[in-house]
Amino acid sequence: MTDGLGIAASSDLVYQENNIPDESLNNLMEQYYGIQTYHVIDDPNNTYIDHIDCWGKYLSHTKVLIREVPNTHPQYSQIEETAQYFASTLNKWGEPWEVYRIYTPNDEPYTNSLMVNDKVLVPLFGGSWDDDALQTYIEALPGYDVMGFSGSWQSTDALHCRIKGIPDTQMLQ
């Protein structure tokens, strides 16, 4: 994920899946994407997919959203460490990130949302935490139209994962 101003973050999967030295990959991120500050973080969910959008999202140039789980959850400590990490890092203006938390007690991927212009599309599950998830986005992003969408979402696969790369099957003929 990126803030659009030269700061990016990803899980350490980026290092695991690319057969080049970490420093070379960091240099490519700067050369091709203009990333001057690159946060590569151990995946706190510790699942098979290790995608950052399953637990975090930059909401703006100053705000980041990190999932929150009950203290009885198996990944509680790792997720809290990740939230603290972001709270201790600085945005482009040298200020600490404003960290918003979104409650996901049953691994709901509310962070796997999609932002398009002034709209935020949030995956919903028909559960008791859906309204709270929408409210978190409304509070974090005043002026945005926050909309919930039900679907066959999974904890590691929701709106952002599915929509960010919709192919045009007729494009290459």
Segments the model singles out, each with a brief description of its role:
Residues M1-Q173:
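Histidine/cysteine-enriched polar flanking segments
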